[in-house]
């Protein structure tokens, strides 16, 4: 059951500390459920009879969140919110046609879709509509988004990796990541191809045919 974060977490920790074995399975949010590991409230799933090599388990996620050869959380087909919150890139078909741009579907199928193409498309469409040099929500944008922090992941540049013992370490500081951030900086700050607004404003701009691309969780497709 869910009332609020603190009540939810206190219910779990109180049950574990009391040894009453009320809960055997917990569905929680990554941002806070992970703290239960440091409180010794979770069981190592690798010590169970569960076969995590089955197709319905997401090996990429489960391998990444394991610690020192132990697994305390697992993600699989039953985790519907994973799909709902998966970051995707929507594109506006009307603007694609109006500007005579090749569909991203075609470019993906021919292995020609990359960030440089997205950047070129976005910069072609972006326009300071009222010529006030303000570049705000009244203009037309090549791309609107909310979470810039997702960009490094798109370039397969992980924030964190693990050594041979399974110990995680920060892997942010690399020449490749510096190149990624330089590209993103130019795209976002210099070229005005992309802008970050609040989710509601992004949705409005995109629905009004004033954004070519829209980065958002998949669940926004239902809006």
Language-model regions: role of each:
Residues 37-40, 61-106, 144-166:
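Periplasmic solute-binding protein
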């Amino acid at each position: 059951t869910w009332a609020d974060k603190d009540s939810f977490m206190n219910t779990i920790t109180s049950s574990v500390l009391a040894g009453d074995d009320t809960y055997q399975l917990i569905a929680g949010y990554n941002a806070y459920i992970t703290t239960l590991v440091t409180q010794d409230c979770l069981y190592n799933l690798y010590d169970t009879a569960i076969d995590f090599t089955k197709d319905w388990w997401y090996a990429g996620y489960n391998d990444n969140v394991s610690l020192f050869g132990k697994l305390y959380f697992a993600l699989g087909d039953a985790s519907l919110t994973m799909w709902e919150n998966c970051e995707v890139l929507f594109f506006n078909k009307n603007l694609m046609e109006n500007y005579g741009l090749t569909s991203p579907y075609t470019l993906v199928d021919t292995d020609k879709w990359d960030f440089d193409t997205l950047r070129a498309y976005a910069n072609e469409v972006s326009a300071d509509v009222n010529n006030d040099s303000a570049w705000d929500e009244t203009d037309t944008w090549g791309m609107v988004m909310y979470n810039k922090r997702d960009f490094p992941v798109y370039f397969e540049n992980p924030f964190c990796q693990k050594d041979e013992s399974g110990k995680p370490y920060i892997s942010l500081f690399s020449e490749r990541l510096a190149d990624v951030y330089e590209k993103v900086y130019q795209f976002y700050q210099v070229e005005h191809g992309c802008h970050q607004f609040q989710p509601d404003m992004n949705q409005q701009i995109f629905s009004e045919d004033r954004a070519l691309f829209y980065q958002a969780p998949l669940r926004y497709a239902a809006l």
